[in-house]
């Protein structure tokens, strides 16, 4: 696990050459076909060294949930373990990890009518007013959700209106836990400035590789639009705004870099608040040092 641009892929390839592992991608962007440059998808050469499961499995017009991921990942893990090898899950989509490790809480599906009612109420009293209502109903969720985060406020209230139970109550009712012994490692540079520099350098490299042309090709499709989960991926939505004429290219690049840094910050926040025990690895340490640490811990838990 780890934030974007932390070196997860390189370490996974090194592990693939050292241990009897098979890689499963845990990334909500890498699942999409035709979105290679902006997602920093492993190259053909990298995939030959370490094939990744659960990448390029969907068209950008399709949606995918944490529940879908859990089902697919469990299937792949069963197949890998049956062959006598070890599943190595690699990626930065923390919600997918959470769903896999803890199961899924029984939250209801969205109800368009109730959402419309909530939005109508927001027009009358504002989202700050609805946030105060949420604080009264579900103090824990209310304190966790930013007063300006209308999407999450809407969802938390919607869940309560549908079920009569708060989001906090329902998320405590998790599904089946993962039926495997799990070792968890997180990789990130200790110095946040290093990660920020890597993100900026990688974004400019993606531009050199043809990221704009990749988005132009997607935008030319009549079935794709900016509100799809695929196009909302960081970098893609900013480049889409540029192609729509809403911002300049320089602004798109700047906003894309900023959005990627914000994503990395959220990923690190998730990891620091993780309930399970995690072994942290410094991205700047030699690969050999990281491999030795992983092998040492693994040998005490798994028969290699």
UniProtKB/Swiss-Prot annotation:
Where does the record place the region Interaction with substrate tRNA? 27-30, 151-155, 232-237, 265-272
Residues reported to bind substrate = 4-9
Q: Does the keyword tRNA processing apply?
A: yes
- The Enzyme Commission number assigned here is 2.5.1.75
Q: Which reaction does it catalyse?
A: adenosine(37) in tRNA + dimethylallyl diphosphate = N(6)-dimethylallyladenosine(37) in tRNA + diphosphate
- Write the record's keywords in alphabetical order, separated by commas: ATP-binding, Magnesium, Nucleotide-binding, Transferase, tRNA processing
Name this polypeptide is given: tRNA dimethylallyltransferase
Q: What does this protein do?
A: Catalyzes the transfer of a dimethylallyl group onto the adenine at position 37 in tRNAs that read codons beginning with uridine, leading to the formation of N6-(dimethylallyl)adenosine (i(6)A).
């Amino acid at each position: 696990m780890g934030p974007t641009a932390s070196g997860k892929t390189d370490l996974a390839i090194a592990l693939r050459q050292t241990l009897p592992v098979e890689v499963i991608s845990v990334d909500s962007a890498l699942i999409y076909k035709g979105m290679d440059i902006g997602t920093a998808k492993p190259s053909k050469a990298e995939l030959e060294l370490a094939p990744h499961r659960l990448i390029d499995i969907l068209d950008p017009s399709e949606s995918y949930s944490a529940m879908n991921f859990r089902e697919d990942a469990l299937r792949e893990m069963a197949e890998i373990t049956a062959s006598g090898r070890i599943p190595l899950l690699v990626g930065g989509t923390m919600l997918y990890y959470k769903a896999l490790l803890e199961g899924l809480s029984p939250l209801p599906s969205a109800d368009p009518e109730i959402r419309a009612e909530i939005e109508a109420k927001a027009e009358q009293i504002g989202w700050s007013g609805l946030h105060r209502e949420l604080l009264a109903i579900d103090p824990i969720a209310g304190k966790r959700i930013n007063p300006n985060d209308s999407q999450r406020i809407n969802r938390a209230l919607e869940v309560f209106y549908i079920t009569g139970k708060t989001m906090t109550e329902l998320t405590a009712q998790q599904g089946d836990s993962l039926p495997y012994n799990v070792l968890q490692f997180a990789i990130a540079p200790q110095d946040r400035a290093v990660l920020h520099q890597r993100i900026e350098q990688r974004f400019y490299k993606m531009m050199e590789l043809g990221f704009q042309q990749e988005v132009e090709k997607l935008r030319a499709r009549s079935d794709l639009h900016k509100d799809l989960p695929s196009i909302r991926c960081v970098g893609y939505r900013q480049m889409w705004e540029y192609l729509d004429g809403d911002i300049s290219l320089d602004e798109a690049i700047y906003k894309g870099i900023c959005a990627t840094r914000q994503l990395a910050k959220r990923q690190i926040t998730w990891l620091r608040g993780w309930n399970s025990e995690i072994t942290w690895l410094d991205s700047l340490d030699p690969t050999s040092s990281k491999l030795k640490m992983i092998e040492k811990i693994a040998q005490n838990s798994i028969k290699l």
